[in-house]
Amino acid sequence: MNMIESAKAQVRQLTAAAYDKAAAAGLLPAGIAVEPAVEIPKDTANGDYTTTFCLAAAKAMKMNPRQVAQTLIDNMTLTDSYFTSVEIAGPGFMNFRLGEKWFADTVSGIETAGEKYGENDTLAGRKYMVEFVSANPTGPMHMGNARGGVLGDTLASVLQKSGADVWREFYVNDAGNQIEKFAKSLEARYFQIIKGEDAVEFPEDGYHGDDIRELAQAFYENEGDKYLDCDEKTRHDALAQFGLSVNIPKMKADLARYGIQYDQWFFESSLHDSGYVADTVQALTDRGYTYEKDGALWLKTSDILAAQLRQEGKSDEAIEKLGLKDDVLCRANGFYTYFAADIAYHRNKFAVRGFDKVINIWGADHHGHVARLKGAMDALGLDGQHRLDIVLMQLVKLVRDGETVRMSKRTGKAISLTDLLDEIPVDACRWFFNAKPETQMEFDLGLAVREDSENPVYYVQYAYARICTLVKALAAEGYTVPAAAEADLSVLTADEEKALIKQLAQYPAVVQLAARDYDPSFINRYLVELAAAFHKFYNACRIKGEAENVLLARLKLADTARAVLKNGMTLIGCSAPEKM
């Protein structure tokens, strides 16, 4: 249900019917095919909806636009419509004003839709995957993971609200160079525990965090010096598997605490073990996109990207200046690169599991990888340009009292997701991290815990709790929230009442916009605006002590606002507490 679109459609219908009637009577030239464009004026003094039909049609009619508008108005019937009046404005705009039927139908429609309010079928029948966080399982999750987690999870919810069949996935990088580095780092700490700190040099490019020391200590307590004298591969495998067996469950627990659950944790190692990476590289070779050099197998990345750029209208000279480079798929030692595995993983998403659209949430530092991966999908015939979308998110800066915060007060280490959740409520974390992905965000730790109107999540939750308190108080006096059909909604004529209903009607369009732009922060901004509209209504329109029909109508409106506030908060993964 989208009452704004319904009103716009009715403006078009009324305008078209008036034109047909006037043309049939010979008052306007017949055969003018102009689709009435309908907008919502920025200034409500100009009506609730406006159309530029007369301006567009007047030229073809060879008439003055205001004359066309007056003729249409004279032949327009508003009976049983959502509108009470239509006026001419400016050079020939027709401005329509809503009547009580639209306001009553909006409240009634929200009641009928219930928790499904805001749902639409824009993406119905489409199978989407959202892959997000996918942090290396070699250490604690950081603030970029925290932001990506909220963005991915909330975007998935918004896409579901728009009718898509959505799959949430975490890609576990449990193979390749970073796991070898992980094993060597654990090995060095393991040796140091047994032989002494100075007996073994730590790898310069190793993982230096205290978490590596803690994992090595736990491994030693479990296994003793059992792996001291065995062959290196056996020791590395044992250390890496132990580290992953500790880190991955902890990641799952932290993300669950954060309100994030996945449909699947997909392991990179499974692509290697099944031979799918090798099969994918062979598929690229069979299509003529690889070559051998210096004992390694290379992907013709530069050719793939150049072909795409030519399709976009770039000249060969401009392409040459970009300095495009090819990528190694298989090293001279026979090991596949991370890029080869990533290509195989995305081929699996499309060719094996059949997703229509794949959305990856990445840090902005991966921007150079976007075109290469899309190009690889194109080379495999999987239309990466249109089926693979990458949302790049900017960095996060934590601040407190105007100062940048880098270390946890409790641990003295770099702040991890665990540290953040220990200090800041989950609702605040999810709210603040759900910001526009392309903007660098500043997370104010002090603001996130404030209990006043400056904190947006508190402001919205307070509006919800305020309504819950009102409903309970009136119930104690014998007034229960009526069904829309039983309330006299025609008494809701105050500007603040109408403004609140108009704001409630915006919600379905906001959901669609958030899904279209891959930007769920539209929901946050909407909720703040809705809370503000409710507070204005509540402060201007007394409920207690009014005549019963007015009291019940306003109570119904307040409860409708409560339902939509909860709907939106649930959509972005925040709670709606009944008490504050």
Each language-model region and where it sits:
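Short, charged, solvent-exposed linker or helix-capping segments at domain edges/interfaces
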Residues: D105-I110
